[in-house]
Amino acid sequence: MTQLEAAQVGQVTRAMEQVAAREKVRVEDLMAEVAAGRVVIPVNKNHHKLQPCGIGRGLRTKVNANLGTSTDYPDIAAELEKLQVALDAGADAVMDLSTGGDINECRRQVIARSPATVGTVPIYQATVEAQEKYGALVKMTVDDLFRVIEMQAEDGVDFITVHCGVTMEVVERLRREGRLADIVSRGGSFLTGWMLHNEQENPLYAHYDRLLEIARRYDVTLSLGDGLRPGCLADATDRAQIQELIILGELVDRAREAGVQAMVEGPGHVPLNQIQANILLEKRLCHEAPFYVLGPLVTDVAPGYDHLTAAIGGALAAAAGADFICYVTPAEHLGLPTLADVREGVIAARIAGHAADLAKGLPGAWEWDREMARARKALDWQRQIELALDPEKARQYRRARNDEGAVACSMCGDFCAMRLVGEYLGKPSETC
């Protein structure tokens, strides 16, 4: 029985109890949200080290960190270091997007070591293997693809990105309308190339019931990928993107009917004034399925700073109702991220998520900020560092820029506003 099936018959699972305790919500309320499909709890029965997290309505905004080998950098040990950095920085989930070296070993090591939710994009491995076996990705067979999907599910992957909405109809609509950046999703481009070469429908769409059978067997959550996500602002919210979203909404319904949890992936590159509309469309067309967004990035001109462009968009998206943010690192559009890039990406996404949780009024979010305000008023530097989203960086700045034992900070010194006002009000900062 999957998490969804259990919830639908009123059965509280251990995963639901764990998530409810962490989120400080009633388990009965959480179960109702899971039963309705508005919350997913990705829990593969073979991921034994997992500490489950819930994604969806009424819960804290979650953050995912991508890692994985490439053909240029196939070092598994380096990616496992990134895994630990991401976990230490507070990532709720990680995705192994490996395309180089021993892909199976990398994934299995990530699953074995990660207490966080683990996701993959199976088409990546299927494509790499087709290239090695046949000399061309377009020669991949339907069975090749589903063999990889089942293998990854059996290994313990909690959710998989599957670009089921890239259909012949959607691709034709893209061709007719035209785009500046065309298709930027790797999975979407692989499938489009395969479809056009073989003159066949997307196997993930044509054989969706087969996909559902595998997902139900292992309780793998489907993350319905946006293969037509906009890769630049000029392409945002166009016909192809929305047509794919309509199809994904229909596939969400079919997944729920089959007892399989599903969430929906979203853009991408979106100008600020279109973000709220994108969230509204997903929630409406996909019947409030949890929304997993890549950023979105709000400008195309900041390579090297795209963790910031994504955090700006992510905060607005999550405040409008998105549930899950995929981090973007400073290396986005430029190269494979370093350990430092991974940390920066996770922290930026967490800031965005927390800012959104404040706007949503989620339990606990406001108390965290109130505690920080009290510590600042009291000039309690140790408490401020403890409460910081990134205590390590806060501690470094405090030590580097201030004399040991200084009551105020080096920005204001004797002219500290907290101290001066506290003294005039007869309420010294140190005792606030």
Swiss-Prot record:
Catalyzed reactions: 5-amino-1-(5-phospho-beta-D-ribosyl)imidazole + S-adenosyl-L-methionine = 4-amino-2-methyl-5-(phosphooxymethyl)pyrimidine + CO + 5'-deoxyadenosine + formate + L-methionine + 3 H(+)
Key word Iron-sulfur present: yes
GO BP of this protein: thiamine biosynthetic process; thiamine diphosphate biosynthetic process
Binding site for [4Fe-4S] cluster: C409, C412, C416
Gene Ontology MF annotations: 4 iron, 4 sulfur cluster binding; carbon-carbon lyase activity; zinc ion binding
Keywords from the UniProt entry: 4Fe-4S, Iron, Iron-sulfur, Lyase, Metal-binding, S-adenosyl-L-methionine, Thiamine biosynthesis, Zinc
Gene3D superfamilies hit by this protein: 6.10.250.620, Radical SAM ThiC family, central domain (3.20.20.540)
InterPro entries membership: ThiC, ThiC/Bza_core_dom, ThiC/BzaA/B
Pathway assigned to this chain's UniProt record: Cofactor biosynthesis; thiamine diphosphate biosynthesis
Enzyme class: lyase
Physiological role: Catalyzes the synthesis of the hydroxymethylpyrimidine phosphate (HMP-P) moiety of thiamine from aminoimidazole ribotide (AIR) in a radical S-adenosyl-L-methionine (SAM)-dependent reaction.
Protein name: Phosphomethylpyrimidine synthase
Organism: Moorella thermoacetica (strain ATCC 39073 / JCM 9320)
